[in-house]
């Protein structure tokens, strides 16, 4: 009986000694099975900076904003252009009754101008706009002209309530936007104007040469 009791005690001691060693592989396997943060998105889906693991270094730039790709900038710029066209279209509906709805016309037109300018800023890129906002770059003439025309339009519509000045401010906004958008072209604004005027003159000369 003494030998049986001693063998039972030895068996229990061996079981207690081998229990932590057997538990460690289970914990290790469980930790290995857990995916990293952001891995559930898959390799084909965009991985945002806030879904990264703690071992990875933080991305360069602002932590509160995700990195915007070129395709996302194009989509956002196109959406801003569509909204700007919608605002311009609604403002055009108020053009026949401009004397009665001058304030709504100015607000819609100004909002369309702001959206069109935001589209141009998105297409240009965030670093360039950041340098402009920090004062590292001098604002262009089109930027200053647009800001002045926008402020004058809002002042004329909301404060002075002058129809003539509101219409002049809206025309100045359109001119500033066209000048800015032409300046964003790769070949420059002067070359684009020359090409447009050359095609216009060519079409006019051809129309004059054709018999009526």
Curated annotation (Swiss-Prot):
Record-level GO BP terms: protein transport; vesicle-mediated transport
TM region(s), chain numbering: 79-99, 105-125, 143-165, 175-197
Keywords: Membrane, Protein transport, Transmembrane, Transmembrane helix, Transport
Pfam families to which the protein is assigned, alphabetical: Got1
Lumenal-side positions: 100-104, 166-174
InterPro entries: Vesicle_transpt_Got1/SFT2, Vesicle_transpt_SFT2
Cytoplasmic side: 1-78, 126-142, 198-212
UniProt GO cellular component terms: cytoplasm; endomembrane system; intracellular membrane-bounded organelle; membrane
Signal peptide annotation: none
Name by which UniProt lists this protein: Vesicle transport protein SFT2C
């Amino acid at each position: 009986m003494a030998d049986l009791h001693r063998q039972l005690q030895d068996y229990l001691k061996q079981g207690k000694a081998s229990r932590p060693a057997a538990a460690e592989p289970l914990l290790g396997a469980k930790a290995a099975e857990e995916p990293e943060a952001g891995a559930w998105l898959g390799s084909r889906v965009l991985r945002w900076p806030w879904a990264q693991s703690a071992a990875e270094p933080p991305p360069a730039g602002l932590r509160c904003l995700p990195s915007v790709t070129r395709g996302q900038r194009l989509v956002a710029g196109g959406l801003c252009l569509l909204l700007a066209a919608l605002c311009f279209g609604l403002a055009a509906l108020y053009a026949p009754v401009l004397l009665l709805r001058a304030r709504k016309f100015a607000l819609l037109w100004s909002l369309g101008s702001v959206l069109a300018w935001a589209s141009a800023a998105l297409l240009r890129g965030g670093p360039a706009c950041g340098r402009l906002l920090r004062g590292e770059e001098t604002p262009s003439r089109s930027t200053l002209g647009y800001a002045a025309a926008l402020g004058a339009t809002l002042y004329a519509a909301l404060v002075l309530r002058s129809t003539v000045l509101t219409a002049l401010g809206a025309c100045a906004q359109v001119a500033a936007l066209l000048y800015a958008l032409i300046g964003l072209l790769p070949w420059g604004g002067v070359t684009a104007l020359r090409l447009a005027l050359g095609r216009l003159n060519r079409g006019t000369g051809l129309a004059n040469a054709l018999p009526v």
